[in-house]
């Protein structure tokens, strides 16, 4: 079996397992069996309905980790798909199926890359590990974060981590994520006095009180970003008030909002500024906060250089380092690993009907991962 067909065969096996969060459907068991044959020690770290796999080969440093998730989002209406989302289907140069791009192809490519690398260089420097979870697309409370806590408790610290998220845009290799913005959400409840719209002097309209404060929040420059991050953004995601009647002044207004923030801001700093702004407008309010994740950044260095060089050698593409997009499990790994980068296939169809990956990209993806291991773990 050729290397590219080995990747294709494995990703087909993974897609055929309908591993919607948090159900792993033995994806990790399949992978562990292969990794054990390549000399990896495999350990399942389960929590609730979530399955996590930690597989490591070697004991020395540096420790290079590949991180990924075996779970996928629900397929949505199956009648909208041109083929069964859990029957891997090759058509017009693409492989279709839920998880094809996000991120079962990355997992298959790295496993085969690790098999090739360890077979060719059994005495390589350092160690290689895989961290896989079935809880990335869901709450993400019993997945990667639990494994990171366990690794921290026993002093097992990765030096480099590649997260196999689908980061590429137009072509394989054009984008790597060397950081991600943080996510801070708020639920703001502004108190008013319900009443009849014909007697506004007997009521207090929380929407009228909220509007100027909300406008100021939307117009505020929270920071200017920095070399790696765009400026922090503020967005309202939901606004609710009233009973549905046209003649009743609402008794309260509820706003859900979110900051995507850079390393130029901190959660506490953003919270303090929001409270000061609301207090300035004289609002009676309650505000609950939820920190979805802090920003992380890997400056240019050994890991970024190794991956960018591997991409150029395999594809000729000059990869761009970017911090745009949503959060990922990289936010948990960055707390125990000094260098984290995300790289994987094109992301145009992730979470969509007819999710797909170009068949011709599977072997280059595997080769990029293998070349990165060579750049990090072989004498230069």
Curated annotation (Swiss-Prot):
GO terms for molecular function: acetylornithine deacetylase activity; cobalt ion binding; succinyl-diaminopimelate desuccinylase activity; zinc ion binding. Its cofactor is Zn(2+); Co(2+). InterPro entries: Bact_exopeptidase_dim_dom, DapE_proteobac, Peptidase_M20, Peptidase_M20_dimer, Peptidase_M20A. NCBIfam families: dapE_proteo (TIGR01246), PRK13009.1 (NF009557). It comes from Bordetella petrii (strain ATCC BAA-461 / DSM 12804 / CCUG 43448). Zn(2+) 2 binds at residues 102, 137, 351. Zn(2+) 1 binds at residues 69, 102, 165. The keyword Cell membrane does not apply. It catalyses: N-succinyl-(2S,6S)-2,6-diaminopimelate + H2O = (2S,6S)-2,6-diaminopimelate + succinate. One of its GO terms (biological process) is lysine biosynthetic process via diaminopimelate. This is Succinyl-diaminopimelate desuccinylase. The lineage of its organism: Bacteria, Pseudomonadati, Pseudomonadota, Betaproteobacteria, Burkholderiales. The gene is dapE.
């Amino acid at each position: 079996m050729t290397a590219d067909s080995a990747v294709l065969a494995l990703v087909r096996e993974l897609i055929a397992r309908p591993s919607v969060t948090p159900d792993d459907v033995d994806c990790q068991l399949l992978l562990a069996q292969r990794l054990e044959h390549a000399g990896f020690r495999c350990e399942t770290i389960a929590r609730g309905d979530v399955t996590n796999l930690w597989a490591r080969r070697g004991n020395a440093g540096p420790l290079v980790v590949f991180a990924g998730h075996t779970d996928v989002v629900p397929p949505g209406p199956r009648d909208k798909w041109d083929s069964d989302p859990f029957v891997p289907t090759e058509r017009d140069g693409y492989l279709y199926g839920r998880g094809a791009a996000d991120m079962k192809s990355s997992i298959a490519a790295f496993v085969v890359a690790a098999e090739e690398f360890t077979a060719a260089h059994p005495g390589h420097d350092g160690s290689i590990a895989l961290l896989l979870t079935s809880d990335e697309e869901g709450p993400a409370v019993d997945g990667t974060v639990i494994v990171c806590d366990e690794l921290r408790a026993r002093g097992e610290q990765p030096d480099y981590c590649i997260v196999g998220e689908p980061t590429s845009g137009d072509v394989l290799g054009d984008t790597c994520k060397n950081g991600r913005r943080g996510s801070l959400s708020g639920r703001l409840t502004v108190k008013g006095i319900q009443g009849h719209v014909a007697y506004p002097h007997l009521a207090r309209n929380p929407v009228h009180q909220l509007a100027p404060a909300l406008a100021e929040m939307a117009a505020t420059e929270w920071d200017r970003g920095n070399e790696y991050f765009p400026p922090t953004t503020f967005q309202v995601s939901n606004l609710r008030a009233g009973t549905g009647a046209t003649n009743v002044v609402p008794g309260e207004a509820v706003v859900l909002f979110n900051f995507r923030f850079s390393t130029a801001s901190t959660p506490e700093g953003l919270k303090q500024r929001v409270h000061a702004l609301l207090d300035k407008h004289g609002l009676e309010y309650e505000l609950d906060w939820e920190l979805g994740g802090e920003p992380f950044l890997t400056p240019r260095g050994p890991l970024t250089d190794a991956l960018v060089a591997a991409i150029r050698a395999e594809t000729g593409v000059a990869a761009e380092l970017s911090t745009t997009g949503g959060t990922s499990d990289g936010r948990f790994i960055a707390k125990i690993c000094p260098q984290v980068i995300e790289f994987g296939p094109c992301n145009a169809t992730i979470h969509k009907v007819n999710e797909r990956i170009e068949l011709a990209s599977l072997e280059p993806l595997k080769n990029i991962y293998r070349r990165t291991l060579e750049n990090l773990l072989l004498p230069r």
